[in-house]
Amino acid sequence: MNEKKERIIKTSIRLFAKKGFAATTIQEIASECGISKGAFYLHFKSKEALLLSACEYYIGMSMNKMKNIEEDLAGKPPKEVLKKQIGAQFEDFRDHKDFIVLLLTENIIPENQEIKQYFYKVTMETDKLYRNALLVSYGEGIERYVADLSIMARGIVHSYMNVMVFNGELNIDAEEISAFIIERLDDLVQGLSRSALNPIVSKDIFNPMPAGKDQLLEDIQKVKENSTLPEDITVSLDVIEEELTQDKPRKPIIKGMLSNLAGTNDKEVERLRALILSLSQFDHKKSSL
């Protein structure tokens, strides 16, 4: 990443944390960076694109640090590795507090499918990292409860970070809190080993994210090419396809076209309709479509 792009990301995160994502304008970011608004658009096509790049920058850095710890401490006791990984998260909190504050205090994920998919992917990767670390640390005996234990471990870490956000005077040492959390995980594992209750969460809680816009556009093209469809269905698919290519698809139009597709006897059309509805930005429960 070039120096100017990195400066824009760091400046924007500081402004987002201070003013809020919605209230911060591109002009303010550009002015704070000492560049023109046009120069901003040379690096990012929108504020949402900037946010996605910022998430990839900071979260990617943190995930790489966690993986590097695992590699660097290969051969060390597994719980020591896990302790270092937990401590690294609190070090990241200290070093990149503005970004963590933004994540914890504001709903920063706008109606942008790329950002939602990115966060879903990161959540799956973090859960996988924790599950593997917990299994190696505590053995196969916890496998039945490993999904619940991963949720509890991540919940403890995030809860302490929340406390640190809302109490700015609280200064917690990363090594001290990571050792404390490992002891609490020991307690949880001991309790689970005696439990006769069924796990709350299944191992496969994270299903693949619904198809994104690019995949849907490809699927629409295939259906139009390979099916003999009535004209009204083809026109409706054309309109949906056109809307999906826009940065901000118009929901009322897509809603109307989805109504046109309802009740067809074509399995591929029905599958497409279900996929479009599965996109959270078009989910009727979330966006009144």
UniProtKB/Swiss-Prot annotation:
Annotated keywords: DNA-binding, Repressor, Transcription, Transcription regulation
GO molecular function, one term: DNA-binding transcription factor activity
Annotated DNA-binding residue span(s): 25-44
Domain HTH tetR-type: 2-62
Entry-linked InterPro entries: DNA-bd_HTH_TetR-type_CS, Homeodomain-like_sf, HTH-type_Tx_Regulator, HTH_TetR
Top-rank taxon: Bacteria
GO cellular component, one term: protein-DNA complex
PANTHER family: ACREF/ENVCD OPERON REPRESSOR-RELATED, TRANSCRIPTIONAL REGULATOR, TETR FAMILY
Protein name per UniProt: Uncharacterized HTH-type transcriptional regulator YerO
